[in-house]
Amino acid sequence: MRLDRFTSKFQIAISDAQSLALGRDHQYIEPVHLMVALLDQNGSPIRPLLTILNVDVTHLRSKLSEMLDRLPKVSGIGGDVQLSSAMGAMFNLCDKIAQKRQDAYISSEIFLLAAIEDRGPLGQLFKELGLTEQKVSQAIEQIRGGQKVNDQNAEELRQALEKFTIDLTERAEQGKLDPVIGRDDEIRRTIQVLQRRTKNNPVIIGEPGVGKTAIVEGLAQRIINNEVPEGLRGRRVLSLDMGALVAGAKYRGEFEERLKSVLNELSKEEGNIILFIDELHTMVGAGKGEGSMDAGNMLKPALARGELHCVGATTLDEYRQYIEKDPALERRFQKVLVDEPTVEDTIAILRGLKERYELHHHVEITDPAIVAAASLSHRYVSDRQLPDKAIDLIDEAASSIRMQIDSKPEALDKLERKIIQLKIEQQALSNEHDEASEKRLRSLNEELNEKEREFAELEEIWNAEKAALSGTQHIKAALEQARMDMEFARRAGDLSRMSELQYGRIPELEKQLDLATQAEMQEMTLLKNKVTDNEIAEVLSKQTGIPVSKMLEAEKEKLLRMEEVLHKRVIGQKEAVEVVANAIRRSRAGLSDPNKPIGSFLFLGPTGVGKTELCKTLANFMFDSEDAMVRIDMSEFMEKHSVARLVGAPPGYVGYEEGGYLTEAVRRKPYSVILLDEVEKAHPDVFNILLQVLDDGRLTDGQGRTVDFRNTVVIMTSNLGSSRIQENFAMLDYQGIKEQVMEVVTKHFRPEFLNRVDETVVFHPLSQDHIKSIAAIQLNRLANRMEEHGYQLEVSDKALELIAQVGFDPVYGARPLKRAIQQSIENPLAKSILAGSVLPDKKIQLIVNNDQIVAHQ
């Protein structure tokens, strides 16, 4: 008999039966081998068929194993197995039954029907189990749904809805869906479209993270609770699993067959099913090959006739890119636009979800934490949408607290490591017998005993606190289950069970929870089980790098003494340092304008007076690293076309995918100092781009993304008017010099640019005393570099004064000083070190001899 007369599943089962016979040293493939192979096969229709017939599959499997054990074994046959005569007869009978049923192919369930008619041991076993030809035929009709077997893959396409969809109404019944708060208008509009006679297919469109899928889940929950119009009551909402539909479709036409079987089953349900297609744009082009039809085109006829009640969900960009390009598909859907919820709506949504997250993480989420998550994420996370970004903050903050409870607290962990370290030292000293070692051992033993006692006390506290925290978790879980049971009872109309739960079990559990929570309220030493606004702020700071957590006393003190810290590196520029320090303090105190950068400054002054140095010092103060500064040399942007490098090339140009130099840097580090050095050398068009940054704290890059500059300090430096400063420094005060410089600046920059800068600061030329202070800083850095190599450097006052005189130049500022230090100190020292005339252990003194600085050791 030809194997290609069997369905593909049946062919695989025959191969499995052959392997089974071979493995058990049987010479012939008997019907029992094939029956075992069909039972064990993944996705075979035999198991569901036997379940319909109320047959205990486990009992049947053990009986078949006994039959296999009784078959004769033959050794040394070289792996040659053949079909037995009983098997051949069974196949002939299968062929006969298939022809009677007008099937083009022989499917697996036909073998079960043939086995019942068989007079062999397999037929006898089925008769004992009470199976008759009539019963099996009825069950086969039920599984097939009135379909003939006209395709080799017919078995795979059966029960397509169970295989390729997820039942959202069933999940809602089981309480597996999160509650949907608000969104009443959108759900009502969706129901309104579903009630139409034709084109009753809403497509929910919105930005990622605004809650499109949640609207469909809300619809499923309303259907379960009978809170929908009469026309939608009793409907099922099924979510199409595109992954399952495409996975394993190896040959052309297989994907289309699967989709067609889903559509056929949906049409049989006669409008009782609402099909939800998440990421609707994936249907356009899915399964598209040369000469084949894609999924979108296969859906069109069913959508137009109103046979298929479909709800789609996709983002605005993907709707424009895929759906709008196909007007025939677009007109079959009705748009339901979903906007981002407000901060107030988000707080309501988070309050509704709070219990689910508390139950999952076994921690308590306070109301200030919910308010902080909504407001802080709205202000500081600009590239994502509410409520998704706020839920993420709550989830991660709760996760971090749970992690601290489950793992050892930091204090306990440090103490344990210290004890291990002391024990290693104790072991090493116990082998030594000199007086010093014995003395050290005695003090070590005392220290070790003290640490172990401290560790034992802390561990006891930790275990007690852990036990106290876990007490409420069981009560919360039981309370959640009781509420779910009450909901089931309400739907089933079981009033006695409902009242028993509502007035007995639930109030009792709530009372227990109150008592347990009060016990937990006692002050914890090591652990905490509450998510507060502090934890939310910490998580946000880690995600974005923006410091939004409450300031510790040390940080407040540091900010109040900010000028003092900056003056240690920036000498003689009092006004500039004050202006910058005030801007940072305003920002950290929360008083700065939330729609503008923290501060925008234009630093003017001659070369070498500390304009760039102040930016570096500020970055170091704020981030403990000068690398946190985004430095852009504006002399690179002298040509008109180079402006595109800041925000990224426009579409169609090379480098479009790479993004802009400025925008990408700020997207990666939203909290940073941006230094636009030598700004007057840039092309005038660059300033048109900066207007938006300085005014609204935002900039749109080449790919249309909005980049947030509200947490940056923008500093621009320029040498404009430096000649006026040099000429009038001795004669005019600071205000007079500033007016002189601004005359030059207003001729170069446009008024709308200068008007948007917060402060224009004029830097003073440096005096002899300033240069001396800078020389001390520079020589201190040199001493630190030498210390790394084991040399100690000491500078005499006379040497310091001499180097300040040599390096002083009122025109070029502090830069000549660097050159003077290199020539007079660093070069001779390098020669001395290489020659070996100075030694690492002894102190090197820089002294003046005959107006020359010499190294003396």
Curated annotation (Swiss-Prot):
InterPro entries attached here? Answer: AAA+_ATPase, ATPase_AAA_core, Chaperonin_ClpB, Clp_ATPase_C, Clp_N_dom_sf, Clp_R_dom, ClpA/B, ClpA/B_CS1
Which protein are we looking at? Chaperone protein ClpB
Residues noted as binding ATP 2 in the record, renumbered to the chain: 605-612
Q: Which GO terms describe its molecular function?
A: ATP binding; ATP hydrolysis activity
Return the annotated region ranges for Linker.
341-545
| UniProt source species | Vibrio vulnificus (strain YJ016)
Query: What SMART domains does its record include?
Result: AAA (SM00382), ClpB_D2-small (SM01086)
Q: What does this protein do?
A: Part of a stress-induced multi-chaperone system, it is involved in the recovery of the cell from heat-induced damage, in cooperation with DnaK, DnaJ and GrpE. Acts before DnaK, in the processing of protein aggregates. Protein binding stimulates the ATPase activity; ATP hydrolysis unfolds the denatured protein aggregates, which probably helps expose new hydrophobic binding sites on the surface of ClpB-bound aggregates, contributing to the solubilization and refolding of denatured protein aggregates by DnaK.
Q: Where is this region: Repeat 1?
A: 6-71
User: What are the protein's UniProt keywords?
Assistant: ATP-binding, Chaperone, Coiled coil, Cytoplasm, Nucleotide-binding, Repeat, Stress response
**Region annotation (Repeat 2) ranges:** 83-146
On the tree of life, the source organism's domain of life is: Bacteria
PANTHER family, alphabetized = ATP-DEPENDENT CLP PROTEASE, HEAT SHOCK PROTEIN 104
Sorted alphabetically, the Gene Ontology BP terms of this entry are: cellular response to heat; protein refolding
Assembly and partners are described as: Homohexamer. The oligomerization is ATP-dependent.
Q: Where is this region: NBD2?
A: 555-765
Q: Does the keyword Protein biosynthesis apply?
A: no
Tell me the PROSITE patterns matching this sequence: CLP_R (PS51903), CLPAB_1 (PS00870), CLPAB_2 (PS00871)
